[in-house]
Each structure stands twice: as C-alpha cells, then as structure tokens.
C-alpha cells in the first residue's frame, strides 16, 4: 500500500509539473508565437490562458502595441575625425498583428535588434561621416531625428512590411571636454553679440523714433506758421478791401459834394443872369455909391448922380455894372467857403 501511495503521489506531481509547463498566460497587447521542435507554427494566440505540449512546444510573446526601443551609447565619427557619442536614441514603433508571424520567421522574435538597432547605428554613422562636428552638434542637429525616422521607415517598407516607426528621439551627443568648453565659450560670445546687436537695434529704433518725432514737430510748427501767414495775408487783404471801399465812398462823397457845389454855382449864375436887368443894375449902382463912405475930390463928383447915358454908350455902362455885380456876387459866395474852412 505504501508503494502504491508513493506511485500515485509521483504521478500527481508529474501531472502537476506537466500542467504547469503546458499552461501559459499572454498579456493584453501581445501575441504568442509557438515553436514545435524548432519549427515556427503559423497559428499565434492572443491574450489569455493557453495550453501547449510541454517540453515539445515553446512560445515567445511579441508586443503588438506601441513600444519604445532604446539604443544607448552610439559612437559616431564626424568628417573632421572627431569621435562623439549619442547617449540615448529612442525609437517608437508598432508591429501590426497580422505581420507578426512573417517578421518573426524572417528576423526572429528579437526582430528589433536586426531591423532597428543595427539600422540606427548604420544611418547615424553615415550621417556623421559626411558632416562636420559643427553641423552635427549645432547646425543640423534638429533634423537628425527626422532623417533617421525617414531612413528607417523606407527600409522597413521593403524588408518588414507591418512594422511602422512612429517617432525617433535623439539626445545631444557627447563631445570631448575641450571642444565642449570651446563651444560653450562660443555660445557665450554669440549670446553677448546677440545682446549687443539687439541693444544697438533698440538704440537705433529709439533714435529713429526721436527723428520721426522731431520731423512731426517741425511739420506741425511749419503748418502753424503757414496758417498764421495765411491769416495775416487774409487780414491784409481784408484791410485793403476795406480801404478801397472807404476810398470809393470818400470819392463818391467828394464827387457828390463837388457836383452839388457845381450845380449850386450854375444855378446861382443862371439866377444872376436872369436878375441882372438894366433897371436892377442901375439900382445896384446907386446903392453902391450911397454905401461908399470914402470922400472923393474933383470936378466930376456932381456928375456921379447924373444920368450919363447920353455921353456913354449903353452897352459899356451895362458891361461895367454887370462886372461890378458879378464881383459882389463872388464875394458873397466866397464868404461861406471861408467859414467852412475855419
């Protein structure tokens, strides 16, 4: 009985070992590919628990979601002979589930070492060998990751369809310490130069602003002066027009006064012409003689009151009296003008 119990226990232990070796679990986002006697089977299994023949069949889990492969400490020689090292390069890739069996058959389950790691080393060395340290470290560093991604994807499209590269991230390479210090000094000088240039631009901008401000002020002063000049010109023109109007009015008044005086004199002369009859002239003669207070001596004094029409022609006497009357009239007419002058 003891022997039977030992056999049963041994068989139970063997069955437990066989079950433990045959049952396996596949995580989500992975596929299991199986090898039987070293040959790859064409039927992979998805996530979950699965059973296989122990000791005869083996499996490998292959990730089919996004994964990041890291390549560290990649050496690279520039065209100038300087050896630099890229500390870390990250490649984000994804394998399509339908292409898992073909890629594993052609490149094993560690396909990333063949298709990604080796290709990164090759492409990076190709890039460095045709560029200087200045270009690799500074000028062209921003395009290295894109160039690597493009070159990788181009080769994978031919060699392993179904494996896609999503992104490539490259860290700054390590360069010799002496060269690094020189670059740091150079960058510091560039920074100082940039600050100087920017300061100069600011000063030039301020000077340009001041110049424009001065031009604007000068233009404003010129415009104000022009407006004031135009205002003065208009004032002078207005004064000139007012003076012309006043002169015209004065001339019109003087002309009207002269016309009135001329008309008055003409009418007075016409009235005198009508008034100077022989009888009136005779009366004026006697009045003038009577009003004369001067004393005359001579033999002809009595004859002054005698009608001398017989001895003198009537025409001559009439002319003398008319001239005398005209002189008296002119004296009377000149008296108002003299008073106006005062």
UniProtKB/Swiss-Prot annotation:
Glycosyltransferase among the record's keywords? no
Membrane topology per the entry is:
Single-pass type II membrane protein
Gene Ontology BP terms: cholesterol metabolic process; SREBP signaling pathway
Molecular function, one GO term: ubiquitin protein ligase binding
Question: Which keywords does the record carry?
Answer: Cholesterol metabolism, Endoplasmic reticulum, Glycoprotein, Lipid metabolism, Lipid-binding, Membrane, Signal-anchor, Steroid metabolism, Sterol metabolism, Transmembrane, Transmembrane helix
The family database entries (InterPro entries) matched by this protein are listed as: Band_7, Band_7/SPFH_dom_sf, Erlin1/2
A single Gene Ontology CC annotation of this entry is: endoplasmic reticulum membrane
Q: Which residues are glycosylated?
A: 106
Source organism superkingdom? Eukaryota
Q: Which residues cross the membrane?
A: 7-23
Compartments (UniProt record):
Endoplasmic reticulum membrane
- The principal location of this protein is endoplasmic reticulum
What function is annotated for this protein? Mediates the endoplasmic reticulum-associated degradation (ERAD) of inositol 1,4,5-trisphosphate receptors (IP3Rs). Involved in regulation of cellular cholesterol homeostasis by regulation the SREBP signaling pathway. Binds cholesterol and may promote ER retention of the SCAP-SREBF complex.
Report the sequence similarity comment from the record.
Belongs to the band 7/mec-2 family.
Q: Which PANTHER family match?
A: ERLIN (ER LIPID RAFT ASSOCIATED PROTEIN) HOMOLOG, ERLIN-1
What name does this protein carry?
Erlin-1
Naturally occurring in which organism (per UniProt):
Danio rerio
Q: Taxonomic classification, please?
A: Eukaryota, Metazoa, Chordata, Craniata, Vertebrata
């Amino acid at each position: 009985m003891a022997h039977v119990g030992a056999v049963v226990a041994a068989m139970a232990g063997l069955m437990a070992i066989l079950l433990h070796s045959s049952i396996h679990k596949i995580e989500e986002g992975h596929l299991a590919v199986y090898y039987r006697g070293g040959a790859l089977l064409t039927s992979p299994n998805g996530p979950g628990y699965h059973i296989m023949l122990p000791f005869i069949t083996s499996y490998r889990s292959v990730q089919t979601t996004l994964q990041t492969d890291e390549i560290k400490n990649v050496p690279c020689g520039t065209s100038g002979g300087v050896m630099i090292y890229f500390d870390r390069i990250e490649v984000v890739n994804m394998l399509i589930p339908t292409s898992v069996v073909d890629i594993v058959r052609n490149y094993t389950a560690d396909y990333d070492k063949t298709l990604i790691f080796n290709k990164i080393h090759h492409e990076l060395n190709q890039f460095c060998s045709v560029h200087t340290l200045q270009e690799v470290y500074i000028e062209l560093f921003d395009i290295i990751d894109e160039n690597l991604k493009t070159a990788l994807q181009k080769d994978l499209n031919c060699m392993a369809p179904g494996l896609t590269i999503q992104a490539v991230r490259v860290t700054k390479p390590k360069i010799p310490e002496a060269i690094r210090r020189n670059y740091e000094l150079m960058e510091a000088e560039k920074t100082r130069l940039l600050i100087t240039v920017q300061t100069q631009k600011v000063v030039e901008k301020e000077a340009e602003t001041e110049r424009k401000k001065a031009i604007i002020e000068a233009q404003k002063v010129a415009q104000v002066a022009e407006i004031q000049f135009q205002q003065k010109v208009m004032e002078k023109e207005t004064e000139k027009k007012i003076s012309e109007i006043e002169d015209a009015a004065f001339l019109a008044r003087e002309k009207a006064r002269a016309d009135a005086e001329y008309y008055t004199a003409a009418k007075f002369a016409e009235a005198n012409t009508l008034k100077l009859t022989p009888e009136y002239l005779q009366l004026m003669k006697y009045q003038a003689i009577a009003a004369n207070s001067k004393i005359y001596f001579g033999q002809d004094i009595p004859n002054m009151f005698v009608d001398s029409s017989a001895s003198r022609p009537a025409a001559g006497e009439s002319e003398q009296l008319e001239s005398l009357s005209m002189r008296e009239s002119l004296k009377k007419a000149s008296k108002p003008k003299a008073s106006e002058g005062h």
